[in-house]
Amino acid sequence: KGVEVLEKAGIMVHVGILEEEAKRLNQSFNKWITQGMPWVIAKVAQSADGYMGINSETSIWLTGEVSRSHAHTLRSEVDAVLIGRQTALIDDPSLTVREVHGENPKRVIMDTNRTLPLTLNLFNDKKADTYVLCSDQRFTQTQTHFCNYLPVKEENKKLSPIHALKTLAKEGISSVLIEGGQEILKSFIEAGVIDQIFIYTAPKKLDDAQLKNPIQLSEEWSV
């Protein structure tokens, strides 16, 4: 109707200019509105031989300054950063924006049984809101001094990635950056819900490594 009004007023109107560019700029909002799910970005660091780490109990740095700065830029551009219980326990991260300018994203942890200790940084630093996704079979939505607990449906005794994303969308979250470990990453890949992937590859191999990067890029993915 707006175009019609302008044309009747004698104003020349061009429709569809830079349409694809506009879609890319608004991709997270468009998906949130049309599908009820956030735009999902996965970030993973790997060794030259494709391993994310030694094992699930050990934290190891694989990236350099440039890739870390890019990771913080990604954090500054999304509504929320998502990790799993194991990453929260081992790294005790804050998931804040550093090295670049930007606001801290919301922090989301997938913790099926709500067993994470409330002494973690994510529950105490007050730098951003923290959400814990837990099983809807055992818990109800609860807001506490430390975080907001959001119940999510289970599939095969694990939280459903699709329902997790729909739950976050209802909280107004339109974009999510996954920084979780192998298990979280694999579950979201298998659910087919990842829209964009960034892989940082270190110029070294890991001896005796067990955590293989689950991402196997098909021809559908552009590099």
Feature roles, as predicted:
Residues 1-21, 106, 187-189:
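Zn2+-dependent cytidine deaminase-like catalytic core
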Residues 20, 32, 39-223:
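Enzymes that bind and transform nitrogen-containing heteroaromatic metabolites
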Residues 25-37:
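Flexible, polar/acidic helix-loop-strand segments at domain edges
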